[in-house]
Structures are given as structure tokens and as C-alpha cells.
């Protein structure tokens, strides 16, 4: 069934630029974009429905390409402790930090995790997110990682959004493997990944390469295991120190390397040559009061596509707004509004391996788009909050109206 969407303007994001079409029209056929361009050039057609968008601006549906949205409990108490001067190390030594989230996640039922994640994700979806990634990594044993990944798959079946599932078993060392990191990595590679991938629960594999997590050599073992299973890889890298994890990610043609505050010029060059996307996470940078900025100019010099994500998680980025991350990326990292919009559309799609079907308004791609109550695209990075979407459309069907 063909529908005509008209009386609008469009920022198509073709090629990662605004690529603006004034006085635009868009034709959908089933779930796909059939035609888009200036309304004056609209070819004759027989449309089952004509939708007047009232002068709204259209963009591709937003994509949140890095979240940890499934977890048990929350850590608002630790937030208060940090503000009172208690260090993260002291909190962790008392059983807090990621260990507390692991305990709460292991104890929670699948239904409890599903309900809490849906509640967290609702604000993102209402604000224009039509695709997202969710990572495991708070289970850290086979049964609990399976539980998390099952919840992620169920969210994909129930939410009006495309949901990609990433196995992050190599997120932290579980307590039962204290002092035995190599043994845990072996368990991930020989037991967890084959089992979880065999059950169809995994779209990609991630790891955390950092002094407080896993070494580049240990991460490489995970990458090799993922490659043997035919799974793409991603990496948390260079958030707190420089271990050149982003270069390792590039060597394995990773979909993305994320955080990147401490990456070097050589790391950026390697990522550019490999086509690995840099996923910037300003929410975590802000909440941790970091001062080391990711090297944006180096990423630009080497042609590295920059995506932006919420990093929604209970410890370092309890962010329920992807649009707020656009403002933070402009204000804290000095990206342009155009770069940030590309970062939550086309480049975010690339970071999930979805660029053939998502991320820009082009013929043949899925008709996932948002009609915004704005006067120019830069407003999406300008306004802090507010109910800006007039309509959120997924697969040519309205899923939210403002």
C-alpha cells in the first residue's frame, strides 16, 4: 500500500550530511521508502492515503547504538555517595559498583528485567528512537547472560523499534573468577559464546578493554572466538587509559570502538582505514566529570565516522534521552549539530551493521522517520528536553504522536 507524506521538509542524512529537501514529499510502499524529493517533482501516483505533516521537519528515526538498558536494581545511592566525596574505589571495595548491579541482575527474574527495561526505554522511543542496541554484561555467568539476552530478544519482539543484541560477557570479572581473568576469558570463548550464539541470542560481541577490566590480549581471544562463530565485534576502548584497544578493534574490522577519550592519532588512523565507527558517549564523560576529551579533530582528519549514543546504564550514564546527548556532544566535545544528527542516524546505523536498511531517508530503506515540531534541524541539538516529535513512524506506520 502506497502512502504519500507531504507538507514537510526533510533532512535525509544521505551521505552523513543534512542533505535538506525543502517542501518535500515522501512516498512509502509497504514498510519501505518508495520515493523522496521536492513535492514539485512528485511523480503521478495512486495513493491509498495522503498524510499532511503540517510543515514538520522529517529526519530518519534516531538510533541509540550503545545501551546497557537491561539490568537489575539501580545505583542512585552510589550517585549520592560520590557527591559526598566517597571514591568509586571505596564504593567498589564495599561491594558496590558494577558488582552490585551483577548481584541485582542475577537475582532478578526474566519478567522483572523485561518490565524494568521497557519502562526505561519508553522515553527514548517517544523521543524518536526507532532502533537501538542493548548489551548484556551484568550477568557474567552463562545462565544470567542467557537471561539478559533472552530479555533483549523479547524487547525486540514487543517494542516498536529494531533491537540489536550484543553479548558483553567480557564486561568485568565475576566474583567467582576473582584473580583468574584468563580462566574467565577461556570460559567465555569455549562455553558461553558458542552456547548463546547457538541459541540465536547474539547479533554482535563486545568487550571492555581497560586496566580495570581485560587486557588487549584477553580481548583478542574473545574477538577470535566471535569471528569463528561468524559474529561481528565491538569494543569499549580508551575510556580511562590508552591501551590501543581501538587499534585492536580496527584490526578485527570491528563495527565500532566506543568511548575513546584516550585514543591516539595512530588509533584514529587505524579506525579510519578499517571503517570502524567511533561511538562517542558524552553522558558517561559528563557524569564521571572526565576532563580528557576524545580527539575529535583526529577522528575528522582520518575520516572516522562518529556516532553518538546514550550509554544508558545504572552506574555512569543513567540517561533516558538520546537528544540530550546531541547537546552534550556539541557543548562538551565541540561537534557540530549536523555531525551529531548524523551520529544518531546514519553513523549509528553503521555502528550496528544496519546502514543498508536504516539511518537515512533513501529509496529502498525502511520507512523509519520522525516528524519534528522544529524550524531547522539544528534545534534537535539545541533544545534541552521538550516534546519535539509530532509523529514517530516505523516501517511506515505511526507508533507515537505528540
Curated annotation (Swiss-Prot):
GO MF annotation list: imidazolonepropionase activity; iron ion binding; zinc ion binding
Binding-site positions, 4-imidazolone-5-propanoate: 75, 138, 171, 239, 316
Disulfide bridges in this chain: none
Cofactor note: Binds 1 zinc or iron ion per subunit.
Function: Catalyzes the hydrolytic cleavage of the carbon-nitrogen bond in imidazolone-5-propanoate to yield N-formimidoyl-L-glutamate. It is the third step in the universal histidine degradation pathway.
Cellular component GO terms held in the UniProt record: cytoplasm
Binding-site residues, N-formimidoyl-L-glutamate: 138, 313, 315
Domain of life, per lineage: Bacteria
Keyword ATP-binding: no
EC number: 3.5.2.7
Pathway named in the protein's UniProt entry: Amino-acid degradation; L-histidine degradation into L-glutamate; N-formimidoyl-L-glutamate from L-histidine: step 3/3
Organism: Pseudomonas aeruginosa (strain ATCC 15692 / DSM 22644 / CIP 104116 / JCM 14847 / LMG 12228 / 1C / PRS 101 / PAO1)
Protein name as catalogued: Imidazolonepropionase
GO biological process per UniProt: L-histidine catabolic process; L-histidine catabolic process to glutamate and formamide; L-histidine catabolic process to glutamate and formate
Lineage: Bacteria, Pseudomonadati, Pseudomonadota, Gammaproteobacteria, Pseudomonadales
Main localization, broad class: cytoplasm
Compartments, record wording: Cytoplasm
